Every structure is written in structure tokens, then in C-alpha cells.
Amino acid sequence: DVPIFVQWTDDSSILVHHSKSEWRIWSDPVSKEEDMAERIEEFGMEVFKNKDIKVLWCGDVSETIYPKLKNNKLLKVNDIYYSLSWPVLDMFKYDSLLPGGHFKDIRNAKSKFYREHKAEVVNFDKVEKKLLHAIVDEWKNVALKKQKEDVYDLKYHKAIDNDFKGFLTARVFVVDGNPVGFNAGYEVVNSPGRFAGIMGIQDYSINELSLILWLEDLDWIKNAGYEKLDMQGDEEGGLKFKMQFHPVIERKTDTFSIIKK
């Protein structure tokens, strides 16, 4: 289950991992946009030479790829499993004070939370790893009950085990003496001033914890001087929450499976 890069002679590549019976592609191939679907086709034809491989999953790939793959005569592309929209927030326009009537409910929830709880933010290395793993486990348990699609917790556990290697920041939210969530992210490669909020995980132990974690992350990113925030992909429910902060939808992605005809 260790992710690997598959590379072509022209330096195109894709990030994948596999089990005994399936492969999974994570996000778009690193290639020219017009070559992305072709790279997935080539990879699919190669892995299906192994008769033990029954399915190839394409996870969160650009919405332009699916229609192109549907034309392949040797591969059967199944219906889209789910689609995500990816909002980007202009941090210059974001005001941490959350002024105006639009943010009244958020301000009230924030004020109530900090009146009722003692909270602090600490670096990840100040908290035992087993406690961070426990946050992820509880997040997964709740998430599986709330949504139909699969919940992938591997990347969170791996990040913890590897001391958040590659992340610019990883901060743990401690409430009333207990670690209850964490935020982590890094700068977007080749995009100066742009930050990716990759991880925001909580254990659902306190009312409004998700909101408060979001506000902590937004404040940190704002204070660090970043111009843009990639808020990460979401479906309708999570997207509705993010749109309160007036981001722009920059792209859409699909997740679907491919089998050999």
C-alpha cells in the first residue's frame, strides 16, 4: 500500500498504489493536459496484463479526462462514483474579524466556543503520535457513518508516522487539555504565495469543533502572508460550508473505476 510514481520516457508520471486485485491512480497524471487521458489508458492497458488485477480506480482526476476515456474500445469506464469541486480563497480579501451580518452566526459560534473551553494550538511534535492516530480513527468512524463513499485514512496515518515530512506546518488543536484535531498543509509547488490546506481532521468530540479548526487554519494562513488558499475538494455538503467564505471554484474532479472489456 506504499504509493509509487510511474514514469514515462518523456517524464510524464502518475502517483499510484495497488493491492492484490486493484490499482488506484491519485489525481491527474503529471503531463501535458492533452496527454492525461492517454497516460491513464496506457497505464490501464499495462496493469490489466496481470489477470489478478480486476479494477483500476482513478481518484480525483480532472473532469476533462472522463469523457475522453469513455471512447476507449478496450477498457470499460464505469459511471462516475463521485465528483468534487475545488474552491480557492483569496486571502487578501479574507478578514479574520469576520465583519458584517453575513458572518454573524460564525462570530457567535466562535465566541461561545472560547467562552466555554480553554484552547491552545501546539506543534505536532508536542503531542504523542498515538493521540494523533486516535483523532484520525475517530474521524474515520464518524465519517463512515455520515457518508456513502469510502473514507481513506491512510494518508493521515502515514503523515503522522513520518512526522509530517514535506509539510510546512502541522498544528494540533488542544481543548481542555485534550488533543481533538489538527491542521496541516504546505506551499503549492511552482505557485508563489499559494498554500494548500491539505489536512483538517477532528474527532467530533465538541460542538462546532469543525468550524473552529477552519478558523484557526484561515488565521494561520492569513498571518503567514499567503495570497491564495487551496481549500481542497468537496461534495455539496462540505462545499456549502466553504462557500460561506466566498472562494472561487477553480476546478472540478471525478472519481471512477475502469475494468478491462
Q: Language-model segments: which ranges?
A:
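Short, polar loop motifs at secondary-structure junctions
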Residues: 60-65, 233-237
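Short, conserved active-site entrance elements at the starts or edges of catalytic domains
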Residues: 127-179
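Acyltransferase donor/substrate-recognition loop-hinge adjacent to the catalytic core
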Residues: 74-145
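Short catalytic-loop micro-motif centered on adjacent basic/acidic residues
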Residues: 55-57, 122, 227-231
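Active-site/acyl-donor-binding loops of N-acyltransferases
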Residues: 77-98, 223-261
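Glycine/small-residue-rich hydrophobic helix-like segments
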Residues: 161-227
